[in-house]
Amino acid sequence: METAQAALYVVIVLVALALAFDFMNGFHDAANSIATVVSTGVLKPGQAVLFAAFFNFVALFVFHLSVATTVGKNIVQPGIVDTHVVFGALTGAISWNVITWWWGIPSSSSHALIGGIVGAVIAKAGIAALLAAGILKTVLFIFVSPTLGFLLGGLMMVAVAWVCRRQRPMKVDKWFRRLQLVSAGAYSLGHGGNDAQKTIGIIWMLLIATGYTAAADKSPPGWVIVACYTAISLGTLMGGWRIVKTMGQRITKLKPVGGFCAETGGALTLFLATALGIPVSTTHTITGAIVGVGSTRSMASVNWGVAGTIVWAWIFTIPASAVIAAIGYWISLLLY
């Protein structure tokens, strides 16, 4: 009885840790959702985070749990995951998020979590314990999502510039200040839909491993879904202002029309990835879209030094979080 009770306590602590990661994901990635709409002056920071948090939560009613299924069932071989693996994965992801948040670097919470899972699983059972299809799909979209965001953002900017070529700049600005509310809402919807499901996936993985949910179940318990969407929304509400300036102005100067095109390109990319069940980086996606918009003016209008720093952070995210996760896994073996 005592052993079963102790095991339950471990599960409760790990669920709380996963929700803390989800909260931090919202906090860390809030800048992605609101940077352009704040930097263009369409909304004040306080208004923007309320706006983004609302649409993060509404995503619960819009998207199927395809991403949660990928994370929960399609990355690791059945029977490998235990509480130590989940502890290591969350330790790696949270630690990397804190490091990059502190330095104001728009890293990817999503890839930190994937790196955490990979590192902890390899520490326990070796690389053969990973499911190649799920890992390759995720790794492929490390490159596809920012590229698609870049192309869609840039193409939309070119199309809008052509359509509005005979309109007065002040009139165009007025139109797109309103339209940017639509694009920011769509992007926040995509952010909530893809990112909250990653935490749903790891909690689902934990509940299957500990016998609280059957592996054959089509979806996790309802409380897991509601808790994860609530946590990411609250995190977004708290905001991550350190990163907003980097995303919204230091990469390239944005006007409302550019903000609209970047957010719409990013949102379309996220909708596609979520429909396909692919956990992507919302950070990579919106950054690619912002660079795409900036490059339509001239390549010199993009601050490639800042963009380069962000790319290096992306490159290091999965290996760094994997190493920390492996250490976390071994530490957990000493703790319980």
Identify the function of each model-found stretch.
Residues 1-336:
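Multi-pass alpha-helical transmembrane bundle typical of ion/small-solute transporters
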